[in-house]
Design a protein with these regions (language model features):
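Adenine nucleotide-associated cytosolic modules
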Residues: 1-174
Length: 174
């Protein structure tokens, strides 16, 4: 497993990222997750404490899971995975969703009710990118409240859904 993220945990992550706690605010996300993974498994876990940009070198992996907030970084990762023929799933918006009942896997061009997906489609079109982009999103309109961010049950459910999709895709190759 290769974990890539240049971010550190902030207090705003407490409501949606299960591996964060008040004790690890300010710690590098990849290192905290690596420690947690090694507590529960014998997996080989490597980390890169960096953001994805046009200079990022994507190696050959069995699968890539994109959970990036930045649209430019998300697009760079998708392009690099496609160039290397590595399957990739991009996670889209979960902010202000109070239901995890409508999690869907589709392609970017078929998403609805998701402002992040709409912005990502705009970026993809602007760059004249024509390949299909596999995504997972919540097909439920966000509530209007600006006070509510992302909820752990929605974010967690999307994460588990993606893990299931990746696992099943890899099983098909066996």
């Amino acid at each position: 497993i290769k974990l890539v993220d240049g971010d550190v945990f902030q207090e705003s992550n407490l409501n949606r990222q299960l591996m964060t706690s008040k004790a690890n605010i300010g710690e590098v996300k990849t290192e905290v997750l690596k420690r947690r993974l090694l507590e529960v498994s014998d997996a080989k876990v490597d980390t890169i404490n960096a953001y994805i940009d046009e200079y990022f070198k994507l190696k050959n992996y069995d699968y890539v899971v994109d959970c990036i907030d930045s649209l430019n970084s998300k697009f760079e990762l998708v392009k690099k995975a496609h160039e290397k023929n590595i399957p990739i799933i991009s996670s889209l918006g979960t902010a202000r969703r109070l239901s995890c009942m409508n999690i869907k896997r589709t392609t970017l061009d078929k998403t609805q009710n998701d402002p992040l997906a709409k912005a990502f489609r705009t970026l993809v079109k602007k760059n004249n990118y024509r390949k299909k982009i596999n995504v997972v999103y919540v097909d439920t309109p966000a509530i209007k409240s600006q006070k509510l961010g992302s909820s752990i049950f929605t974010v967690g459910s999307v994460g588990l859904f993606i893990a299931s999709e990746v696992f099943n895709d890899l099983l098909k190759e066996c």
